[in-house]
């Protein structure tokens, strides 16, 4: 019986990877339309740029570029959902981003790291911006730069 459950768990894990790949497919490949946004802001001594793609069914996917004070850039691909005025997205490492859309061009972003540390910040929101196929922000030399 233990072997059965182990095999079942292994099959579920192997089957989950293609599902995430399909969810992360570019909007043009799936035939669905996505709204794109760029969020920029600071948290502690780092700055971030988030490319976010929202589908009509409430799914979101995005890429977070976190630039530390020494210039190193870490990249995080996140997946989640939007409902009403709130959103939630997770990274495979256990990091979680939640928050709400504020009036105007701001979004409240709450970050919970996999180790439990929490941060809250307000990001500036740019709507209908070009992003890469995987929703990553374009290089900072493009038209939407962080202020």
Where are these regions (language model features)?
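Bacterial N-terminal signal peptides
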Residues: 7-17
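Boundary at the C-terminal end of the N-terminal hydrophobic targeting segment
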Residues: 16, 21-26
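Central antiparallel beta-sheet cores of small beta-barrel/beta-sandwich binding domains
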Residues: 24-102, 108-146
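Positively charged n-region of N-terminal signal peptides that target proteins for export
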Residues: 1-4
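General helical structural elements
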Residues: 6-7, 129
